[in-house]
Amino acid sequence: MSSEHIQNKLALLPDQPGCYLMKDRQGTIIYVGKAKILKNRVRSYFSGTHDSKTQRLVQEIVDFEYIVTSSNVEALLLEINLIKKHDPRFNIRLKDDKTYPFIKITNERHPRLIITRQVKKDKGKYFGPYPNVYAANEVKRILDRLYPLRKCSTLPNKVCLYYHLGQCLAPCVFDVEASKYKEMQDEIVAFLNGGYKTVKNDLMKKMQEAAENMEFEKAGEFRDQINAIETTMEKQKMTMNDFVDRDVFGYAIDKGWMCVQVFFIRQGKLIERDVSQFPFYNDADEDFLTFIGQFYQKANHIPPQEIYLPNDVDSEAVQAVVPDTKIIVPQRGNKKDLVKLAYKNAKIALNEKFMLLERNEERTVGAVERLGEAMGIPTPSRVEAFDNSNIHGTDPVSAMVTFLDGKPSKNDYRKYKIKTVEGPDDYATMREVIRRRYWRVLKEGLPMPDLILIDGGKGQIDSAKDVLTNELGLDIPVAGLAKDDKHRTSQLLFGDPLEIVPLERNSQEFYLLQRMQDEVHRFAITFHRQLRSKTGFQSILDGIPGVGPGRKKKLLKHFGSMKKLKEASIEEIKEAGVPLNVAEEVHKHITAFNEKAKNTEQK
């Protein structure tokens, strides 16, 4: 769609709140946003300068739609639904839910107490989230001892062990009034909302009474229940003393990114936090609102009794998203400190993100730039490294790995079976591989490397340079990586005549060379082992009547390794798809081979 068409639509935008939907060339909705004034917000995308991520979004926009709403709150609610419906790729994408465990009282005629990670709208009562299953199980274990709800998922025909332990009312056999269940459910709710202290006091009285009546076994049971309550419910440091469930939000922004931290406070305890980081395209407070809206659309994020927000957030809009929750913007005291703490953690997380990015760039792009400077060549953004592998000249192979801006590009890795060289001739092997690789690069117009690294010394380097210059007419820098007596990277050889490039052993550019040399060596060795395994497998099967190339291939595919074939019975060999008489011949041949190998070892 033409730029003129966009400009005409921009001129018609209203001064009202609403949502806008950006579309790409295929008509796919790639971004949904909301605005207090549509005209100002949408026009801002097509005027002025933007950071790189916003520019990427704008470059893909070829059309847009908008929906006018009566208020900013209504726009927020609509935006949440539109994002949920279209899942635009440029919008905030919350990480996959880390599903926390909840304790649930099921909505059944005979309710159960269970632990679940799935929160559904099924009229069950949910308590949590808990930081892990262990914590949830600890609490459930106490509740099971105090409140004898049924344990079986389906009712049996007779009472079970839990009835004899006093932990089930046995509704499978006895009638249990609904009022009894309601009484227990109310007590569980009170217990989990901080009323466990009352329960503990009641148990202490019962323990004393039982002891006075010489009922020591019963007193011991009460004592164990009291200990369980103390160790499970009181071992965490209290953050608030009113047992109210709260979510505390804080966010920080930097370099076009936002980090939101949510503290989950349950029963007065800070039990867990959620951290989300994402690029934002609107005003920070607007995108933060969008985040909250999406956050509580997730099945495992149940709105608590209270939500604490920073000062600059439209609390009225949040209230519309979670109408049954009290929205608070704390101004002072402990509550304000919690919001500040969430902000501080968000800021630290963002700083850490960018520091890690800088460190990663230092060891990749930065290392490549300094390597080029040390060698006196343009920055070698694309490096192709070669290594040969053989054992006494058998099954010779070579391998090439590619690094782009200091990072391995595995799609550009290549393996080579050596075709023209017999015996252990490393120089001839290098000539063949360089010839095959760069003849194809020339023929197919593939990207040329800025630097070729050879795992070897002067002979290998000269062989590679001779092919490049005199056969292919290419002028590509070639350097060699020499190793010490412990097979570790020790020197970079480059120039004409060859000289050692002075590099600090603890520099990032030296570490980069080590990674390249280790990677190409690993790749070559792995390929050589695979080839040896395959050829070794086939050679053992040579000369067996009825086993030609096709059946060798079938046996290799079925068993995967010689070791497994050696251990196979005749019946198992037959299962590979060969006739019984052939399976018997294979088994006989391999048994004889194993015996011969065993006798050789003993001698």
Curated annotation (Swiss-Prot):
<keyword id="KW-0227">DNA damage</keyword>
<dbReference type="Pfam" id="PF02151">
    <property type="entry name" value="UVR"/>
</dbReference>
<dbReference type="InterPro" id="IPR001943">
    <property type="entry name" value="UVR_dom"/>
</dbReference>
<keyword id="KW-0742">SOS response</keyword>
<comment type="subunit">
    <text>Interacts with UvrB in an incision complex.</text>
</comment>
<dbReference type="InterPro" id="IPR050066">
    <property type="entry name" value="UvrABC_protein_C"/>
</dbReference>
<dbReference type="Pfam" id="PF22920">
    <property type="entry name" value="UvrC_RNaseH"/>
</dbReference>
<dbReference type="GO" id="GO:0005737">
    <property type="term" value="C:cytoplasm"/>
</dbReference>
<dbReference type="InterPro" id="IPR041663">
    <property type="entry name" value="DisA/LigA_HHH"/>
</dbReference>
<dbReference type="InterPro" id="IPR038476">
    <property type="entry name" value="UvrC_RNase_H_dom_sf"/>
</dbReference>
<keyword id="KW-0963">Cytoplasm</keyword>
<dbReference type="GO" id="GO:0003677">
    <property type="term" value="F:DNA binding"/>
</dbReference>
<dbReference type="InterPro" id="IPR036876">
    <property type="entry name" value="UVR_dom_sf"/>
</dbReference>
<comment type="function">
    <text>The UvrABC repair system catalyzes the recognition and processing of DNA lesions. UvrC both incises the 5' and 3' sides of the lesion. The N-terminal half is responsible for the 3' incision and the C-terminal half is responsible for the 5' incision.</text>
</comment>
<dbReference type="InterPro" id="IPR000305">
    <property type="entry name" value="GIY-YIG_endonuc"/>
</dbReference>
<dbReference type="InterPro" id="IPR047296">
    <property type="entry name" value="GIY-YIG_UvrC_Cho"/>
</dbReference>
<dbReference type="InterPro" id="IPR035901">
    <property type="entry name" value="GIY-YIG_endonuc_sf"/>
</dbReference>
<dbReference type="GO" id="GO:0006974">
    <property type="term" value="P:DNA damage response"/>
</dbReference>
<comment type="similarity">
    <text>Belongs to the UvrC family.</text>
</comment>
<dbReference type="Pfam" id="PF12826">
    <property type="entry name" value="HHH_2"/>
</dbReference>
<feature type="domain" description="GIY-YIG">
    <location>
        <begin position="15"/>
        <end position="92"/>
    </location>
</feature>
<keyword id="KW-0234">DNA repair</keyword>
<keyword id="KW-0228">DNA excision</keyword>
<dbReference type="GO" id="GO:0009380">
    <property type="term" value="C:excinuclease repair complex"/>
</dbReference>
<dbReference type="GO" id="GO:0006289">
    <property type="term" value="P:nucleotide-excision repair"/>
</dbReference>
<dbReference type="InterPro" id="IPR010994">
    <property type="entry name" value="RuvA_2-like"/>
</dbReference>
<dbReference type="Pfam" id="PF01541">
    <property type="entry name" value="GIY-YIG"/>
</dbReference>
<keyword id="KW-0267">Excision nuclease</keyword>
<feature type="domain" description="UVR">
    <location>
        <begin position="197"/>
        <end position="232"/>
    </location>
</feature>
<dbReference type="Pfam" id="PF08459">
    <property type="entry name" value="UvrC_RNaseH_dom"/>
</dbReference>
<dbReference type="InterPro" id="IPR004791">
    <property type="entry name" value="UvrC"/>
</dbReference>
<protein>
    <recommendedName>
        <fullName>UvrABC system protein C</fullName>
    </recommendedName>
</protein>
<dbReference type="GO" id="GO:0009432">
    <property type="term" value="P:SOS response"/>
</dbReference>
<dbReference type="GO" id="GO:0009381">
    <property type="term" value="F:excinuclease ABC activity"/>
</dbReference>
<dbReference type="InterPro" id="IPR001162">
    <property type="entry name" value="UvrC_RNase_H_dom"/>
</dbReference>
